[in-house]
Amino acid sequence: MAEPPRSCDCFVSLPPGSKEDYVIFGKNSDRPRDEVQEVVYFPASSHPPASTVECTYISIPQVEHTNAVVLSRPAWLWGAEMGANEHGVCVGNEAVWTKEPVNPEEALLGMDLVRLGLERGDSARAALNVITALLEQFGQGGACRETSEPFSYHNTFLLVDRQEAWVLETAGKLWAAQKVTEGVKNISNQLTIDFEISAEHPDLRSVAQAQGWWSGEGDFSFTAVFSPDHPPARMEMAKQRYRGGTALLQQHNGSVTAEVMMSILRDKASGICMDSEGFRTTGSMVSILPRNPNMPCVHFLTATPDPSRSVFKPFIFSESVRPVSMVMSPQYGPGDPVRTLPRFQHQVDRKHELYKAHQMANTSSDAGVSLQDTMRYLESQCLEEIEAMLRGEVQGQELGDLFFDCVDAEIKFYQ
């Protein structure tokens, strides 16, 4: 059986790695080739006591208050591949395999945990605490793609806010976390936390010792102890992307901007911009998180596949965010194949309006190339305006309409 298509790359730059006094976050979501990724916004909400929330496969107790979030997600599920909340927290996840067996039973997906961390955490560390507590209570498991063929994995996460970043790596309910306060860091479908463990599951070392994976003597390396003896080919291939991502970050260390992060996500030579027969980059995100709390965070999302052929469009949280139905997939209600048992017995069309327009326009013809050049020029102009706004040189106008206006303009250009 062919190796299942699943890989991702997450990046962060903190001062002095960044050119300005900003934290810069980036992620490519690499998924099955025809999977549609939508961008959805959910406002902050209050919830009645004892209420529950229905995640992709299971329901769990809801909290009293959830943060406003913007999410980029495979259109069939509840959670998200990546996203941000109103407090300037960004989270992205990655598939990983470890010595701990993967749970095929339905539990929380790593993508559910991304959304739950954003909805419930007002800092990167708070989101990490949310995720690890839910892991302990409900575990992780279930099908991670829209198919009846079983495919599950464990997860690693990059959690970022205006001040710091956390790498969280899991093995079943066990986990280790590393705090990053300066410079650049990337993760790619493999364990990376060695001896520098900032926080960990209380039973991490005792379980490792009981399983015979660690002698109990000497330094404890999470990567060495928990990496599988025979990793899937996908994890082995990720090493090339990890090295390529590290090299690109180091090349720009001290001068990382949102534009630099976008160029890294568009890099095909390293495999970071994925495009092959079975899978590709289906959505991308770059965020600017200024250290100054009086400045707004800006989140750029594509809502379309292949960042080298897509436009990053800015989203800023405000009191009145305009809904953007053009990047939201059709709803199928109780008859959705993810909701009917047994699951995934038939396929539905999840393409949203922008996805269709992007698909039609992205040809190899001269007209297609010319259109791409125009769109890239408009993107660079938008970036310059955002940077000027962050420097205080121009006033931000109607921030809640910004993402809508950019999506609307992109569709009109394609037509």
UniProtKB/Swiss-Prot annotation:
* InterPro entries found in the cross-reference section: Peptidase_C69
The domain of life is Eukaryota
Q: Which GO terms describe its molecular function?
A: cysteine-type exopeptidase activity; dipeptidase activity
According to its UniProt entry, the protein's GO biological process terms are:
proteolysis
Annotated active site:
C8
- UniProt record similarity statement: Belongs to the peptidase C69 family. Secernin subfamily.
- The protein's name: Secernin-2
Its source organism is: Danio rerio
> Gene for this protein?
scrn2
